Amino acid sequence: MSRMLRGGKQMINLMDMSIPGMKTHLRLGTKYNKHIYTDAMSKIVKGVGGKQLFNLFDVSLRDGLQALKTPMLMKTKRDMLHNIISRNVKHIEIGSLVSPKILPQMADSVKLFEYSKTIGMDDINYYMLAPNSKYVSKALDIGVENISLITSVSNQFQLKNINKSLEHTKDDIDKSISIISNSKLQVNNLKLYISCVNECPIVGKISPSMIVREILYYAEYDDITNICLSDTCGTLSVDIFEQIMLILLLEGILPSRLSLHLHCNSNEMERVNSILKVCMSHGVTMVDVSFIESGGCSVTMSEEKINRNLSYLDIYDSLK
């Protein structure tokens, strides 16, 4: 709801969409001047002085929802999609092609993807996550032109998450890329999430050398347009991140190929802000965000250990 203030300026309660049982990315009760907020988001998305600040990738409909036990109505998901589109982001993950027995919330991802194609926003890249080569084939069959794949730097995590070892995942991703290359459908973007950067929820901390080794392996695939460093546990420190970034850049990986997926809680924003500043200093502009305060890997983590996704407001606050 919004109201008018003196002088005709509109104030907006930035919890501009009600989702039962959930908070949006903007803290409950928080109010901002709508014009100031809109201007700030425009600068984030479009840049300042010709220099882009962040290229936001919205994961609200996939990572933001996947841990919810009660399936959300399609109408609510459609409303969420329009809410996301209104934020001027150009990359939106619609859902995941996965067995509904594993993630019931993703059961209608295909229907939501089909709906997205009727909206008429040709400048938006709609993504679907495909956890293995079988679902990559399905994604291509339904016309998905932007696909997300997943791996990690932890063998135990990968076994629990998708029932494949890291080595078997490598084989399957190679198969997925081959399927995409031989497809009649032109795939515009291929994103690869590399989970457990810094820490695995099962075995604990992962050495930076192991993390870098796995990233460099996948960087050899020219078909992978976006290598996303995913801080699954929400414990990545700025020092470790800086160390990883410097090695990757020295190895010749372009900043434009890298992106970041953070998990956090509202009590540790200094850490998050420092990491985002490192991103900006090295030219890494793509960052995953969600406008609902949820997210995380429910397959491998208990509810009390899951930290939420980075939000739009977190990005906004980091630039103040």
Each model region followed by its residue ranges:
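Glycine-rich, positively charged N-terminal anion/phosphate-binding segment
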Residues: 44, 74-83, 87-124, 128-138, ...
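Hydrophobic faces of well-ordered beta-strands that scaffold small-molecule active sites
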Residues: 55-59, 63, 92-94, 124-130, ...
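Active-site mouth loops of central-metabolism enzymes
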Residues: 59-76, 125-132, 159-162, 196-209, ...
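Alpha/beta enzyme core
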Residues: 74-91, 137-149, 154, 178, ...
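Glycine-rich, proline-tolerant flexible connector loops at the mouths of alpha/beta enzymes
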Residues: 90-115, 152-164, 198-199, 228-238, ...
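Active-site beta->alpha loop and helix N-cap motifs at the rims of alpha/beta catalytic domains
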Residues: 96-99, 119-180, 189, 196-206
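Alpha-helix-loop-beta-strand connector modules within alpha/beta enzyme cores
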Residues: 102-127, 169-183, 188, 242-260, ...
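Catalytic alpha/beta core domains of metabolic enzymes, predominantly
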Residues: 232-319
